[in-house]
Amino acid sequence: MSARLVEEAALDWVCAHRDRFALGEDALAADGQVNGTWKPLGELAQVCASVSVATAPSDPLHARVTELLDFAWQQTHKGEMFPLMQSLEPFATYPLEVYAAFASAGYRHPGYEASAAVVARTRGWRLTEQYPTRRLGVIEAERRSGLRPHGKVPQALDRTWLGGLPEPWTFERAAGYALTHVVFHLTEWGRTPQGVPPDLADYLRHWLPPWLDTCLEARMWDLSCELLAVAASLPSPPEPAVLEDAWQRVAAAQHACGAIPEEGSAQDAAPPGQDDPYAFTDCYHSTLMAVFAAALTTARPTEAEHAGQGVPG
């Protein structure tokens, strides 16, 4: 099965479960669970924004992700909820990170951007303690939202796991998710492959294939799809055979309903014979990542010739 067919089936599932991404009454609650409200909505917005750029306006998938973006924006009351979130949590960065996904697709709220710019100038904002990858993401969120970034990308990149070009054998789950998001931030979610510095691009060209194979073998479908998105975001992607094999394995993991579970354990626990066997939280992110990775892969055909001879690391 091709990446395109995986994408179409996965997007079918997302559209069928659109209402599960809707914000509930707890979206602004003091004890609300951000990971169950704003996180899924923000991830939906980011994936749809990226896919809308990667697909031609004449492509039926383009219209579908645009409709999903409109739905997601309506959930924020056309941006009115972002100033409310800021008033409740002035120094929380997740509202800006979610907003940046919308802003990158042209959905803007000038009032929120003005107030966010004021907060971003404070020492309290600049000194918020964060993991290095998150810091890089906030800097990029500021830029995409029209704010002046509070730091510089090269310095932020140097503090990340990937930026240090670590020994390849130190790769594990947490490092995998960190490196994928570093690449997403550097390339504006796959839009600008040249945003990956040459040394990182060369390093990933050599080590991404074995890491991807390891994750696929372990049935870590969510991380595997993120790594496939990284592969499609590099200046020079991996060998075609690597990607073809990976997509075949992802396709084999995809349920007939279009959903892809985050982990193989969800497949093992799924009751047989059900049309939609996975809990939303067990599959929504990996299914979104499959849409994202497939769109980038389809939009940017793998190069037949690859540069680079040495093996870094």
Segment roles from a protein language model:
Residues 44-45, 138-139, 183-185, 227, ...:
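Short beta-strand elements that form the blades of beta-propeller/WD-repeat-like
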Residues 1-57, 116-123, 160, 235-313:
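Terminal, non-catalytic domain-edge segments
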Residues 1, 15-17, 29-30, 59-70, ...:
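Intrinsically disordered, low-complexity segments enriched in charged and polar residues
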Residues 218-229, 283-288:
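Amphipathic alpha-helical protein-interaction segments enriched in hydrophobic
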Residues 73-222, 232-234, 247, 251:
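Eukaryote-skewed repeat-based solenoidal scaffolds used as protein-protein interaction platforms
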Residues 26-104:
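N-terminal entry module detector
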